[in-house]
From Swiss-Prot:
It comes from Xanthomonas campestris pv. campestris (strain B100). GO terms for cellular component: cytoplasm. S-adenosyl-L-methionine binds at residues 184, 217-220, 236, 256, 272. Monomer. GO terms for molecular function: S-adenosylmethionine-dependent methyltransferase activity. This is Ribosomal RNA large subunit methyltransferase M. It catalyses: cytidine(2498) in 23S rRNA + S-adenosyl-L-methionine = 2'-O-methylcytidine(2498) in 23S rRNA + S-adenosyl-L-homocysteine + H(+).
């Protein structure tokens, strides 16, 4: 078969299927999504998979944790010898620079984690013997993915390391430090890691910059920014953790973060407030339009139904009302739940 394999958060398969269908139609490539709710992945079947993958950049996909081009689908694998049919299916392929053996991040997929680990150890030497895998990982070469959907059912796929998630399953393994004020700190950590390139992080998040955190309490996002030595105005009627204030980089204003505005322009504004997504999109657009900040990261809490439609509406609303030339990226992060995280950067 030919198509794209994209991983997603369990339960968001319809949103990813709708996104892939809409984006493929926009670039003029015909295809259809194959998925079931709670699978943790979507197959977008099309004849021009490589061309579609080139047009749909991983960083631009909202609900996809990972983006892969399918090479083959193997069913009825013999548990005693899965390697032989995989080698046969890969015959004629160029050499790969790495191998990741995976499973969907779903209730049905997680029990396959042990198989994925052990099979990867068995498959690597066989691939090297066949001339299909380098001795050491080489990022400049395509990366081979084997995704087990069941013990006898696997998808073989390939990734461009420069246009795919650099983590197995598309999940960055971030550790919640004991001093983090809340688990929400992981969301901003992941947003900075996922939505910005390494070069952008170095250029746009510098010591001495000034930021506002709207709806800051108890201080998770503020704490993440202070670890980058950014000066933060934390706006919330609720309290911040004492050790966050003790950094000397934080000014706590007891005010309504949704209506507060700064006295002078800031480098960054971040916001993780529980509010209707369209209201948030409009308020964030006001911040950009009025020049109150150059860059922003904010969350949009999605409704239970028509989440892809609401996502498109909110992003369109934000860009229209911002009235600025922006680079906008959005992702449903691993540490997000019923929400997406949006980055907007001025040039």
């Amino acid at each position: 078969m030919s198509g794209l394999l994209c991983y997603c958060r369990q339960g968001f398969e319809p949103e990813l299927a709708a996104e892939l269908s809409a984006r493929a139609a926009f670039v003029g490539i015909a295809g259809y999504a194959r998925t079931q709710r709670n699978d943790g992945y979507v197959l977008f079947v099309c004849d021009e998979a490589a061309q579609l993958a080139a047009r749909l950049q991983w960083r631009e996909l909202i609900f996809a944790r990972q983006k892969l081009v399918v090479l083959a689908e193997l069913k009825g694998l013999d548990p005693k010898d899965r390697i032989t049919p995989i080698l046969a299916a890969l015959d004629g392929q160029p050499r790969f620079g790495d191998l990741w053996v995976e499973h969907p991040d779903s209730d049905a997929g997680k029990p396959l984690a042990g198989l994925a680990r052990s099979f990867g150890n068995a498959l690597r030497p066989a691939l090297r013997k066949a001339g299909l895998l380098t001795d050491k990982p080489q990022a400049r070469l395509p990366r081979l993915h084997i995704c087990f959907l069941d013990g006898d059912h696997a998808l073989l796929a390939v990734a461009d390391s420069s246009d795919s998630a650099p983590w197995p399953l598309g999940i960055p393994r971030l550790k919640l430090l004991p001093e983090a004020p809340s688990r929400s700190a992981l969301k901003l950590d992941e947003a900075l890691l996922t939505l910005l390139t390494p070069e952008e992080r170095e250029q746009l998040v510098k010591p001495g910059m000034r930021a506002a955190d709207l709806g800051a309490a108890p201080g998770g996002w503020t704490w993440v920014l202070t670890r980058q030595h950014v000066h933060v105005t934390s706006v919330d009627n609720g309290p911040l953790r004492e050790h966050v204030l003790a950094t000397g980089l934080v000014e706590h204003l007891r005010a309504d973060g949704f209506h507060w505005k700064p006295a002078q322009p800031l480098d960054w504004m971040v916001c993780d407030m529980v509010e209707q997504p369209r209201r948030v999109a409009e308020r964030m657009a006001t911040w950009v339009r009025e020049g109150w900040c150059r860059h922003t990261i904010f969350n949009l809490k999605l409704p239970m139904k028509k989440r892809w439609d609401e996502t498109r509406l909110c992003l369109d609303l934000f860009e229209q009302q911002a009235e600025k030339s922006l680079t906008v990226r959005a992702k449903q992060l691993y540490h997000d739940r019923e929400e997406i995280t949006v980055l907007a950067m001025r040039g």
